[in-house]
């Protein structure tokens, strides 16, 4: 009834319920303006809904859909509009950042911290969307649309969660001077696509992103004119979300008072929109952790396998021997290599008769953000 009431000019959808897509579509079809915090609807149905809003002369605003109280959507659409966005690195999910912060502090393992996060209300009873990385992927798809003119949904970009991160990974990262965070990354590729991916990554411990703690979010954008811009704040919660929703409502009211036209046009992508690139074409540094038999020639074979796929080793650390099992833990850090080659090499290493279990692979991002010293 509200949607078709002639006295209603703006429909605000904050339910997060499954029918939300239908309600938003119906409201736009009726010529209403819509404000929503529903990232899934915007990420998965944006093409259709933005085109519909433009056709019907309405508007669709969604500041609260990404990073809660951080005004990242409006900053990209207006404040940074004169820039070509070169890259974006972000911590976009408060639940996983809270969990990784606690695990990094040594306050428990994955299962313990997840249970604590659920008890405190930071994680849903079913935490899959958060811990799998899909929540961050949907947010990155939205940011990719605005910042990079990229077309695609959260399901179209590479997504890996934190479910398999172990305390031993965190300790190994610390010894190397790194901290593990769930990162959302987007950047241009040489062939006109957009490299967009969400996964755990090792970032230098002195970097700003490594020092974003608990449920807070942060986004670093490199613009062609402004250089590095860092946005930081509460990524979720009742009041930050309400702040973003009200800001959208105020913007709509200001437009109506001034007679300004809808601003939806920049969200409707044309034939020149860039697709998301395949992660297998990405060139990244890698951390590998494996347990192998303690015998001569093992490291030489592993080195040869990596070399066969044109993967260069930056450093190797061998831990003390497990006296009971007769195995040792090897940690290998590589120089930049193509993801496709790395996956092939890891599969070959895991197939060797002296390798025990699966090799742990974590991507490394050294060029993420300025250090704390540079910020100060």
Model-derived features with residue positions:
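A short hydrophobic/small-residue beta-strand
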Residues: 33-35, 313
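Rossmann-fold NAD(P)-binding glycine/threonine-rich loop
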Residues: 17-30, 39-78
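Glycine-rich phosphate/pyrophosphate-binding beta-alpha loops
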Residues: 227-229, 233-239
């Amino acid at each position: 009834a509200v949607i078709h009431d002639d006295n209603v000019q703006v429909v605000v959808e904050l339910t997060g319920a499954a029918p939300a897509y239908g309600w938003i579509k119906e409201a736009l079809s009726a010529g209403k303006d819509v404000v929503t915090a529903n990232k899934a609807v915007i990420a998965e149905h944006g093409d259709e809904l933005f085109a519909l809003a433009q056709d019907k002369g309405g508007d669709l605003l969604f500041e609260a859909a990404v990073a809660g109280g951080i005004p990242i959507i409006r900053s990209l659409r207006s404040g940074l509009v004169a820039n070509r966005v070169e890259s974006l690195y972000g911590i976009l999910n408060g639940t996983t950042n809270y969990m990784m912060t606690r695990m990094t502090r040594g306050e428990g393992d994955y299962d313990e911290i997840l249970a604590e996060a659920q008890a405190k209300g930071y994680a849903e009873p079913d935490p899959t969307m958060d811990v799998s990385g899909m929540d961050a992927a949907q947010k990155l798809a939205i940011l990719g649309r605005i910042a990079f003119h990229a077309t695609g949904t959260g399901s179209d970009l590479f997504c890996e969660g934190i479910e398999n991160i172990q305390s031993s990974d965190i300790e190994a990262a610390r010894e190397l001077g790194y901290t593990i965070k769930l990162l959302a990354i987007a950047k241009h590729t040489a062939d006109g696509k957009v490299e967009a991916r969400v996964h755990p990554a090792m970032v230098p411990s002195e970097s700003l992103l490594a020092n974003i703690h608990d449920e807070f979010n942060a986004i670093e954008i490199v613009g062609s004119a402004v250089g590095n811009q860092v946005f930081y704040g509460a990524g979720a919660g009742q009041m930050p979300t309400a702040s973003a929703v009200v800001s959208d409502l105020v913007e709509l009211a200001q437009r109506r008072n001034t007679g300004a036209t809808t601003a939806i046009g920049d969200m409707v992508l044309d034939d020149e929109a860039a697709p998301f690139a395949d992660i297998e074409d990405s060139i990244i540094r890698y951390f590998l952790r494996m347990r192998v038999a303690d015998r001569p020639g093992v490291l030489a074979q592993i080195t040869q396998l990596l070399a066969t796929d044109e993967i260069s080793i930056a450093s190797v650390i061998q831990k003390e021997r497990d006296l009971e099992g007769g195995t040792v833990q090897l940690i290998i850090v590589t120089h930049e290599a193509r993801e496709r080659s790395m996956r092939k090499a890891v599969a070959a290493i895991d197939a060797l008769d002296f390798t025990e279990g699966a090799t742990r692979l974590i991507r490394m991002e050294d060029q993420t953000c300025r250090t704390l010293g540079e910020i100060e």
